[in-house]
Each structure stands twice: as C-alpha cells, then as structure tokens.
Design a protein with these regions (language model features):
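Conserved N-terminal beta1-alpha1 strand-loop-helix module at the mouth
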Residues: 1-49
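Glycine-rich, proline-tolerant flexible connector loops at the mouths of alpha/beta enzymes
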Residues: 42-75, 129-140, 205-221, 304-310
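Catalytic cores of alpha/beta
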Residues: 102-115, 192-196, 221-224, 244-250, ...
Length: 318
C-alpha cells in the first residue's frame, strides 16, 4: 500500500513510521533483524531504508603507491526493503539519491523496485562526499532532487530513458520528498526553500518528510508557511532521540538542526550517556505528544542505532 493510502485510511489518526540504516558491508541480515525486531512492537505503518553514496578511499598498491577507489559502506537498500516486506509484512520505503548514481543506474534500481512490489520511494539529492565542500553529481546523473523526481514520474507514465521503447510498463511509485523546518542549509532563505519544495510537489511529490527538529514550533511554522505557498500534501514530522552529549555538537553540524537551550541545558547536567538517554527520551516523548495532539499524519522516527529509545516513546503514546 502507498504511504498516502495509509494516511488516508488512518482518517486523521497519527501513524508511526521508522527509518533505518542498512547494515555495514560485511554484516549479515541478522544485524538488521536485531535492530528491527524490537521496533516492530511500535506497529509501524511503513519503514524507510536509507541509501548512501560511495566514499573515496585510497588503497596502497604493492609498489607503495596509492589507488583511489570508490567504496559503498552500506549497500543493499533495495534488497533490505524486500527482506523487510517479506519478514514483517510491512511496507518499505526505498530512499533514492542523486549522488553517486547515473540516470541509468537509477532506472535499473527503479525497475528492480517495481518488480519487487516496492511502490514507495523517497527522492533526495543526498549529501556531498566527505571532505568535499560542494555536491557534484555523478557524470550522467542528476544534480537536483527535482530531476530525480521527474525521472520517477516519467516511469510512472511509461517513459523510460530509451525513448524508443514501445508500450513500456508504467510503474506505480508513491513519491516522497524532504522538507526542512529550519530550511536547507544551502538555501538563501526559508521563502526560497519553500518555493523549491512547492516545485517538487507540482512535479509529482505526494508527501513530505521533514528533517529532524527539536522545537515543535518550527515544524508548525513550516507547515503554515507551506500551506500559504499552496503546498497541500501531507507533511510528516521527523524526530530523533538525543542519546549522548557529543550529539549537541554533531547534530547542528551534520543535520543543521538547532537544539533548544532548555534541552541542551538538561543534557549538560548529565554525568553519563544513560542519563542523557533519559533526558532525550522524555524530550522526544513530549514532542510526540504535542504533535499527535495537533493531528500530524505520521510520527516518523529516525532510529539510527537507538531502537529502545524509540520503542519507549511509542509505547507511552499507545
């Protein structure tokens, strides 16, 4: 079932969804089940599986010189989506990114997803490679998320890269995109960022999932601004638990999300990571309760290695 169909069927009730990372290369499927098994108590409507571009590494050759090689540390998104749907009978949402993929590779991935009956995708530009300041597309790939989105909508209309294909099968993907309650860090201002989001919705995006935030008012303001811009698709809030003091610096730097002073003050008082987890869980619980009371369509949790914290919150919401 499509994400939008789940939302429509819920008839105003807030659903639960989860987001996971693929296991590192070399890890077996058991690593995924160990992460997901406890999370299934949350009764998620769907589970997002991230996609990551390859990273450049230098490997020493026998003569002492180095070769630059591209290594994908977390492969397997398409296979993991299929495995999740087979084991748990829960729909999976495959992330698609521009970075590191050609248009042909993207089309091949979409064909695989379509064959497997995975009908939900989240299209993203993706980040710049590590140690590089700016995003550069793969030769023959997409530079912007809206271009990737248009490729998916083309396939939904039976239009493939090989234009001479006759009577090509139409795919049936439900397409989500990302939204930024604190604006995308590359956008000059919030207004221009929302206009770009509106362009993606006009191009076929059916729902929005936000970047993590820790101040609900920023989400409410974002939703209102989107409505004023004519964006009428569901806007799903993304939530993440803080579990270590280190994240007070890592999250703003990596995800460009502010951490409220009240939250950071409480975390700084903690002497152990266990104490931080208690504070982080309570904060996310209060966020979740307020958002649920406001009638958000879905509460989307970035689990990122902390399934127990998410489970604790969801159990108290049930």
């Amino acid at each position: 079932m499509k994400v939008t169909e789940y939302i429509e069927k819920a008839n105003g009730s807030s659903l639960i969804s989860l987001e996971i990372l693929p296991p590192l290369k070399g890890k077996g499927i058991g690593a995924l089940w160990n992460h997901l098994d406890p999370l299934m108590e949350c009764k998620p409507a769907f589970i997002n599986v991230t996609y990551h571009r390859s990273e450049s590494m230098f490997k020493r050759k026998a003569d002492g010189t180095f070769d630059k090689v591209e290594v994908r540390k977390r492969p397997g998104t398409v296979g993991i989506c299929a495995a999740i749907m087979n084991r748990y009978k829960v729909d999976a949402v495959a992330h698609l990114i521009c970075g590191g993929f050609t248009k042909q590779e993207t089309e091949d991935a979409l064909i695989d997803l379509n064959f497997l009956g995975i009908n939900n995708v989240l299209v993203l530009r993706g980040d710049a490679p590590k140690n590089e300041a700016f995003f550069e597309p793969e030769p023959g790939g997409h530079k912007y998320a809206i271009e990737l989105l248009q490729q998916v909508t083309n396939m939904n209309n039976g239009i493939y890269l090989e234009e001479d294909l006759k009577n090509a099968v139409k795919s049936n993907f439900c397409i989500g995109v990302a939204g930024y309650p604190e604006k995308h860090f590359e956008a000059p201002n919030m207004h221009s960022d929302i206009l770009y989001l509106k362009a993606k919705v006009d191009a076929g995006a059916e729902y929005v999932v936000t970047q993590m935030f820790f101040d609900n008012q920023k989400y409410f303001n974002f939703v209102q601004a989107c409505k004023e811009a004519g964006i009428e698709v569901p806007i799903i809030p993304g939530l993440k638990p803080i579990s270590t003091k280190k994240q007070l610096n890592v999250i703003p730097r990596t995800f460009h999300a502010d951490i409220p002073e009240a939250l950071s003050n409480e975390i700084m008082k903690c002497k152990t990571d266990e104490e931080v987890e208690v504070v982080g869980t309570e904060w996310m619980l209060q966020q979740s309760r307020e958002l649920k009371a406001a009638g958000v369509p879905v509460l989307h949790y970035y689990t990122l290695g902390k399934p127990n914290m998410v489970c604790n919150v969801v159990k108290q919401l049930m």
